[in-house]
Amino acid sequence: MNKKTNERPVFPFTSIVGQEEMKLSLILNVIDPKIGGVMIMGDRGTGKSTIVRALVDLLPPIDVIENDPYNSDPYDTELMSDDVLEKIKKNEKVSIIQVKTPMVDLPLGGTEDRVCGTIDIEKAISEGKKAFEPGLLAQANRGILYVDEVNLLDDHLVDVLLDSAASGWNTVEREGVSICHPARFILVGSGNPEEGELRPQLLDRFGMHAQIKTLKEPALRVKIVQQRELFEKSPKEFKEKYKEEQNKLMEKIINARKKLKNIIIKYELLEKISQICSELNVDGLRGDMVTSRAAKALVAFEDRTEVTPKDIFTVITLCLRHRLRKDPLESIDSGYKVQETFKKVFNY
């Protein structure tokens, strides 16, 4: 059974001109959500939110338990709410429906209660029940959580989002009452670097960092304007034109997810990734792990079996540029340092 919703038409992902760096980062995160999300920084009006919304249309629908606010997975106990788990244990019948992969927008003025959910303490004390009103993290479970202008969001709230994205769980505690529910989502943040960067400690926790720039070539700019006009004139007709390409890309993503666990990366390549991280003075081991994961996701996407140095070169800038130590007044490196170190280590 499908849940029908009236949704505004979304610009097709395969019709988007340029911005390959951002598109690749998003696709790799969809193939392997354990990469840890993506931070997209770029000028205003460069299509950041358009591309993120377009991505959701490429994702296959998911099976959920009907009327469950957490998008519980009927087949995976790790992705079930306590209520659903209780019903399954008691062999109670649950209704399964199919819905689009959820995408949740976090508004800039969002509060912690709105994001995490709230506990009705009075009801909990008077009736002895855990009265919980789920928040945006519950809605985003098994989907994408998009935060535009994440660099303007309160640091504490960004921390909460990153904690949930990393652990796959959201825990709310009030007055000794505690609620825990699955919150496994891909975190996508975007912002304009002119309005300030995130603190390095928070930035480091995003798996990848894509930079998006205003296209300079007149021919490409004209093409974008024309496509936008055609889409606004007749969204259905425009989407139909790209239907075959969209389906092919969706199929590639589904196949890549299945192949991912069988992708091989040789020990010497892992060693060289770590050598690059070490020479760049990257703190911690996140950079090493994310680069390896992203390279494997790329190989799966391209329907191959083994990671090559070229695959690492393709993804390593996206995985490391935001982890380099820098002067507070400097902007994030475009990738020159990472690429030069890669070439030196790999004799590339």
Curated annotation (Swiss-Prot):
Coiled coil: none annotated. GO terms for cellular component: chloroplast stroma. ATP binds at residues 42-49. Keywords: ATP-binding, Chlorophyll biosynthesis, Chloroplast, Ligase, Nucleotide-binding, Photosynthesis, Plastid. Disulfide bonds: none annotated. It is found in: Plastid, Chloroplast. SMART domains: AAA (SM00382). Pathway: Porphyrin-containing compound metabolism; chlorophyll biosynthesis. SUPFAM superfamilies: P-loop containing nucleoside triphosphate hydrolases (SSF52540). GO terms for molecular function: ATP binding; ATP hydrolysis activity; magnesium chelatase activity. It comes from the Eukaryota. Its EC number is 6.6.1.1. GO terms for biological process: chlorophyll biosynthetic process; photosynthesis. It catalyses: protoporphyrin IX + Mg(2+) + ATP + H2O = Mg-protoporphyrin IX + ADP + phosphate + 3 H(+). Involved in chlorophyll biosynthesis; introduces a magnesium ion into protoporphyrin IX to yield Mg-protoporphyrin IX. PANTHER family: MAGNESIUM-CHELATASE SUBUNIT CHLI, MAGNESIUM-CHELATASE SUBUNIT CHLI-2, CHLOROPLASTIC. Belongs to the Mg-chelatase subunits D/I family. This is Magnesium-chelatase subunit ChlI. It comes from Euglena gracilis. The gene is chlI.
